[in-house]
């Protein structure tokens, strides 16, 4: 089995095709910036696209650092983050077709997670961060970080998928960093086992990078992580 991650983003790209599934959210766009005002502790937004161009910014204004916004891309296209994403709370980006952070991407939040595994609405609303994929053996999707991800003191960063490559910088001062690959991944924010992974043992998997060259490891790390 193999995957080939293709990515492209235009300079003027901002997330589009929003549908607020849960919570109270007001979204406004002006020129190169998008403001997402969230007034409930939890919000779920489905998007046709969640791309951010290099000179563009997306800002989540949330009621507290414990508030969270789950952003799910449903179009079938991968997500490319090349600009700025900031939040005073927690942001989750779910795209089962891939998430790519370019070298110009900057992420700043209390906590941040990007995943190509699914997370159900019910689990999220019940504080169960249980990510899963029923198609891992058929189609692997990757998370590739070449940018800068920073979370507030005590926050967490999680990159989860069929394959994860971190070439960028992740700062989680006094917090946690989790890079996980598997068919099922659970984030336990209250216990000692922050990241729990179930990996299929009966799969022969070949990973291809963006140049269609074989990669030996499902997790590659050549960047910087501080927690």
Task: Annotate the PLM regions.
Residues 1-227:
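Extracellular and secretory-pathway beta-repeat/beta-biased strand scaffolds
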């Amino acid at each position: 089995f193999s995957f080939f991650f293709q990515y492209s983003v235009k300079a003027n790209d901002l997330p589009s095709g929003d549908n607020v599934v849960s919570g109270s959210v007001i979204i406004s766009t002006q020129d190169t910036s998008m403001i997402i005002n969230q007034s409930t502790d939890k919000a779920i937004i489905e998007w046709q696209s969640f791309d951010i161009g290099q000179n563009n910014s997306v800002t989540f204004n949330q009621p507290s650092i414990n508030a969270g916004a789950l952003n799910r891309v449903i179009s079938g296209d991968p997500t490319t983050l090349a600009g700025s994403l900031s939040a005073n709370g927690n942001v989750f980006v779910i795209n089962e077709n891939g998430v790519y952070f370019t070298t110009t991407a900057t992420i700043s939040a209390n906590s941040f997670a990007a995943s190509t595994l699914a997370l159900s609405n019910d689990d999220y609303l019940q504080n169960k961060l249980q990510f899963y994929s029923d198609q891992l053996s058929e189609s692997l999707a990757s998370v590739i970080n070449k940018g800068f991800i920073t979370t507030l003191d005590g926050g967490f960063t999680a990159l989860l998928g069929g394959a994860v490559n971190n070439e960028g910088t992740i700062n989680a001062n006094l917090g946690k960093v989790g890079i996980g690959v598997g068919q099922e991944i659970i984030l336990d924010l209250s216990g000692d086992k922050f990241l729990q992974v179930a990996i299929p043992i009966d799969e022969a998997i070949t990973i291809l990078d963006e140049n269609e060259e074989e990669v030996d490891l499902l997790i590659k790390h050549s960047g910087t992580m501080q927690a």
